[in-house]
């Protein structure tokens, strides 16, 4: 039992720790039983492959023989990849929040052999620093508590577990109203940094689910403050150092309020959602810089993030032990590479002889992104890209996550329509086919994570929701009935596997193995939309497309299960709120004809779902008994069984969806 067991995993993050002197175990009953047999606590460490501070703590503590000896003697040590097991991460991050800590990664928790958390934190340094104890001091303190104050520790763990269980309990059912949307929208609007863009102070995250909701609120209210909040974020992202101006793609967050310096890891989910936001904003008011950033980010996805036909999870922040080394520049490097072009490039991108960040330069535009300037410097950027390609590359976490790929597929479909980019649609179709073939277990259920064809974790609600949403996006773009059929089948399966008696949904399936003690119901969004919010959108879109009563009922019950939450909680669930708005005022736009279909797919209203009609594929008429237009090409907007009169040209179609 003394060996490090992480080589048994497929996770790139866990494999990074496979040579640690720590006797790491994989998450599961076996580790808890070992702790029970040895009568010691569990030390649970949760991180992810692209996490800079996870690497720092690993180097400082987990690679240290003396620290590892203490860990091995006094604890059963368990490593978890948060991307592979978001259910475990959610449970124990919630426990840390309940203890009054802000949270973050690496997440370090101490558990009873039953898995109850009684103490925790995030990163601890190897020596006392900045008012923090050293990691060894923490280990000694926890061991002392376990030996001398165990009853108190177990009581604390039981109380925290009970609190987490109460959060997962069913709430009084209710119904959302436009007043709830108003309250949440204005609460979020008050958080906007109107000068720098985005929300709050440093560190700054894109918070894409919030801005997607603010965009839908602009569609509902036509209040320009909501539109300007979205534009303010996107303008800042397009110009700032958080965007990789040489290679494309956006970093996870900025360490400053101005978006100047990123934390350099690149996550698939961020780039998917930002690409989709760029498409929505460009559809509302075309801006060439949005199209340029979307196309370059797509190029980065195809060049650097492919895992077969699907997409990999993340790129690391560190190269050769140094954060951001791959991405930053010295001024003389740029002089040598660009020659006569160097002066204009350095002036545009704030390149200084002394550096603009820790002696080196993060490329960022000094002025708002200008498409003319951007295009004029494309040759210079290409030269730097060729030079940068000779450097040691950041590590790629090449596991395939179903939910994140679902976000990416839907974003690419949206981008294909708005930016007239059929290559995005082809990539989306290929990725979807890869998920449908490769992300299933022996029983045919979707799984959450695979790597090299090996299953890493069972499927969660977020996977079913993201996959179904991706299928619906592809149906809107192609009209192929198999996508609609797949979405319906996955939505029905999710209601069975994840369903609660009140119409709500659990994160984990009813047959989940080795899950946390509490089966969570997660309706608030984080960096990604909640599975509940996404599945609510799926139910609503299926209702609009098919007019089947089961989908309206499913949507109403799912939204209603959380409608009784406190207003502050609802403001943290923008995806669920957007689904309610879609149910209340959305509809199905039936279109036939290439020009009308293209216009429909490029429109800005997220509450309108497109039904591309090919009469040869629907010989028995439209779902729900709706009549097909008598004349082709034509379009009509249906809400339930009520449809508009047909329109026959693009201008009339746009007037119809904007009415």
Region locations from a protein language model:
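Replace the tail clause
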Residues: 1-411, 415-418, 452, 559-659
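Inter-helical turn/loop segments and adjacent helix faces that build the functional surface
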Residues: 217-221, 281-289, 415-422, 474-481, ...
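Glycine-rich, acidic and aromatic/proline-enriched surface loops and short helix-turn segments
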Residues: 236-243, 430-438
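Long, polar/charge-rich, low-hydrophobicity segments
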Residues: 303-306, 437-464, 472-620
């Amino acid at each position: 039992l003394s060996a490090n067991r992480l080589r048994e995993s497929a996770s790139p993050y866990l494999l990074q720790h496979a040579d640690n002197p720590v006797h790491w175990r994989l998450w599961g009953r076996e580790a808890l039983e070992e702790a029970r047999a040895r009568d010691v606590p569990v030390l649970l460490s949760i991180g992810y492959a692209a996490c800079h501070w996870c690497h720092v703590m690993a180097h400082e503590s987990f690679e240290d023989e003396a620290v590892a000896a203490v860990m091995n003697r006094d604890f059963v040590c368990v490593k978890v990849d948060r991307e592979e097991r978001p259910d475990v991460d959610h449970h124990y991050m919630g426990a840390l929040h309940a203890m009054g800590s802000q949270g973050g990664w690496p997440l370090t928790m101490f558990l009873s052999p039953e898995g109850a958390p009684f103490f925790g934190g995030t990163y601890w340094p190897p020596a006392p620093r900045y008012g923090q104890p050293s990691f060894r001091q923490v280990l000694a303190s926890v061991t002392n508590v376990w030996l001398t104050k165990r009853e108190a520790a177990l009581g604390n763990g039981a109380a925290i577990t009970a609190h987490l269980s109460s959060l997962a309990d069913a709430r009084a059912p209710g119904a959302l109203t436009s007043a709830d949307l108003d309250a949440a929208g204005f609460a979020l609007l008050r958080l906007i940094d109107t000068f720098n863009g985005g929300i709050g102070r440093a560190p700054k995250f894109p918070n894409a689910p919030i801005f997607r909701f603010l965009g839908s609120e602009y569609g509902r209210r036509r209040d320009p403050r909501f539109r300007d909040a979205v534009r303010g974020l996107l303008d800042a992202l397009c110009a700032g150092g958080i965007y990789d101006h040489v290679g494309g793609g956006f970093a996870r967050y900025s360490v400053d309020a101005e978006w100047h310096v990123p934390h350099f890891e690149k996550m698939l989910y961020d780039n998917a959602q930002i690409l989709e936001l760029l498409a929505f904003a460009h559809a509302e008011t075309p801006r060439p810089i949005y199209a340029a950033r979307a196309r370059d980010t797509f190029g980065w996805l195809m060049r650097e993030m492919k895992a077969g036909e699907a997409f990999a999870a993340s790129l690391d922040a560190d190269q050769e032990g140094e954060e951001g080394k791959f991405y930053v520049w010295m001024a003389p490097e740029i002089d040598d590479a660009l020659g006569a072009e160097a002066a204009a490039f350095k002036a545009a991108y704030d390149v200084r002889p002394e550096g603009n960040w820790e002696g080196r330069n993060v490329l960022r535009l000094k002025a708002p992104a200008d498409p003319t300037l951007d295009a004029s410097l494309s040759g210079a950027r290409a030269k730097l890209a060729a030079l940068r390609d000779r450097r040691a590359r950041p590590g790629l976490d090449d596991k395939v996550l179903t939910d994140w790929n679902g976000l990416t597929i839907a974003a690419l479909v949206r981008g294909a329509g708005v930016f007239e980019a059929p290559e995005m649609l082809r990539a989306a179709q290929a990725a979807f086919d890869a998920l449908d073939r490769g992300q299933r277990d022996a029983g045919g259920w979707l799984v959450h994570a695979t790597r090299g064809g090996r299953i890493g974790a069972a499927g969660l609600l977020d996977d079913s929701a993201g996959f179904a949403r991706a299928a619906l996006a592809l149906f809107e773009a192609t009209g192929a009935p198999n996508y609609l059929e797949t979405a319906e089948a996955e939505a029905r399966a999710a209601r069975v596997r994840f369903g609660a008696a009140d119409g709500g949904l659990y994160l984990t399936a009813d047959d989940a193995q080795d899950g946390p003690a509490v089966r969570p119901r997660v309706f608030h969004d984080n960096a990604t939309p909640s599975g509940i919010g996404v599945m609510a959108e799926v139910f609503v879109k299926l209702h609009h497309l098919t007019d089947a009563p089961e989908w309206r009922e499913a949507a109403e019950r799912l939204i209603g299960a959380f409608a009784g939450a406190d207003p502050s909680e609802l403001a943290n669930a923008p995806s669920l709120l957007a689904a309610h708005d879609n149910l209340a005022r959305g509809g199905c736009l039936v279109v036939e004809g290439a020009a009308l279909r293209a216009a429909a797919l490029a429109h800005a209203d997220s509450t309108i779902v497109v039904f591309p009609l090919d009469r040869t594929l629907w010989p028995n008429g439209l779902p729900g008994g709706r009549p097909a237009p008598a004349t082709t090409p034509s379009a009509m907007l249906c809400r339930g069984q009520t449809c508009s009169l047909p329109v026959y040209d693009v201008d009339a179609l746009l007037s119809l969806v904007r009415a």
